[in-house]
């Protein structure tokens, strides 16, 4: 189990939009959780499960 995620690091799980984990990489969706997903950020939209919008977006710089 990922200590920052409610789902196991292996096996299937659901990565919902309300994900609160920091480093969840679920094999079933192959996406990581991201706290920065401003409007128009295509990179985050494709590779992250958004935890919440933020103006300070480091993963999309």
From Swiss-Prot:
Pfam families noted in UniProt: Metallothio
Ligand binding (a divalent metal cation 5): 34, 36-37, 50
Annotated a divalent metal cation 6 binding sites: 37, 41, 44, 60
GO process annotations (BP): cellular response to cadmium ion; cellular response to copper ion; cellular response to zinc ion; detoxification of copper ion; intracellular zinc ion homeostasis; negative regulation of growth
List of residues binding a divalent metal cation 1: 5, 7, 21, 24
Residue positions binding a divalent metal cation 7: 50, 57, 59-60
Keywords: Metal-binding, Metal-thiolate cluster
PROSITE patterns per record: METALLOTHIONEIN_VRT
Residues that coordinate or bind a divalent metal cation 3: 15, 19, 24, 29
Region span, Alpha: 30-61
Chain positions covered by the region annotation Beta: 1-29
InterPro entries per record: Metalthion_dom_sf (IPR017854), Metalthion_dom_sf_vert (IPR023587), Metalthion_vert (IPR000006), Metalthion_vert_metal_BS (IPR018064)
UniProt remark on domains: Class I metallothioneins contain 2 metal-binding domains: four divalent ions are chelated within cluster A of the alpha domain and are coordinated via cysteinyl thiolate bridges to 11 cysteine ligands. Cluster B, the corresponding region within the beta domain, can ligate three divalent ions to 9 cysteines.
Protein name stated in the entry: Metallothionein-1B
Gene this chain is encoded by: MT1B
